């Protein structure tokens, strides 16, 4: 049987700039432990089933699949979110949108809208920081709405809600103090789409016509 240290040393991820971190996250999850456990007990030997699970996950990562999709979880802001292949992986860059939104408006009762909510990352981060806000998230993909609602329930954020809508279509003239969105912004055929994690993410959440500006124009106009 291989030890934790041996499994990590032999975990090869040549195309990942975060190879060691990726391997530690996968092994810790396979063991049902924290990363600190790996460093505290490097000599311990995982059970055969745990080692097999780790090997399978490592093989998927070697093919380029993001760790977030393999584990079904991703950290965003101060939240731990469930993610799935039909939604984008919440990115650290998107936290800037949350920061700006929090700076724009005070913590007084108001309605806020997140267009194209995906996993609910932006809406839930805002709801967690501003308990007096009522934050509504919409997405045209019902599976994404269901995922966002599961995240909301697990985080116990009663001031957030999610419903299906293609942008404003199902909102029937509702008005909001603030609208946030991270819409598709990449033009079809962009070479960027065939590299890295984007190969595994939903094209409909990334690609739009008009050289990547059609949805942005539709939201603004």
Residues of each region from the PLM?
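Mobile active-site "lid"/loop adjacent to the S-adenosyl-L-methionine
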Residues: 184-215
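Non-catalytic nucleic-acid substrate-recognition regions in nucleic-acid-modifying enzymes
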Residues: 1-20
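Generic alpha-helical structural signal
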Residues: 5, 9, 52-56, 95-99, ...
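Residue-level signal for the nucleotide or nucleotide-sugar donor/cofactor binding architecture
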Residues: 49, 89-92, 143, 147, ...
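Conserved SAM/SAH cofactor-binding pocket of Class I
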Residues: 92-192
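Conserved AdoMet
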Residues: 25-103
């Amino acid at each position: 049987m291989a030890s934790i240290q041996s499994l990590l040393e032999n975990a090869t991820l040549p195309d990942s700039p975060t190879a060691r971190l990726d391997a530690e996250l996968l092994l810790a999850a396979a063991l049902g432990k924290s990363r600190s456990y790996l460093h505290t007990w490097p000599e311990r030997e995982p059970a055969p089933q745990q080692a097999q699970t780790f090997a399978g996950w490592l093989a998927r990562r070697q093919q380029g699949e993001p760790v977030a999709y393999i584990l079904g979880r991703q950290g965003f802001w101060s939240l731990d979110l469930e993610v799935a292949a039909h939604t984008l992986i919440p990115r650290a860059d998107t936290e800037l949108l949350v920061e700006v939104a929090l700076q724009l408006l005070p913590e007084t009762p108001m309605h806020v809208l997140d267009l194209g909510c995906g996993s609910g990352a932006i809406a839930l981060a805002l709801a967690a920081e501003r308990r007096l806000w009522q934050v509504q998230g919409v997405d045209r993909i019902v599976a994404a709405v269901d995922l966002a609602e599961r995240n909301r329930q697990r985080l116990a954020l009663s001031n957030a809600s999610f419903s299906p809508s293609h942008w404003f279509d199902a909102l029937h003239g509702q008005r909001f103090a603030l609208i946030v969105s991270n819409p598709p912004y990449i033009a079809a055929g962009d070479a960027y789409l065939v590299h890295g994690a984007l190969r595994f993410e939903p094209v409909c959440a990334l690609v739009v016509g008009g050289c990547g500006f059609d949805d942005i124009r539709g939201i603004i106009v």
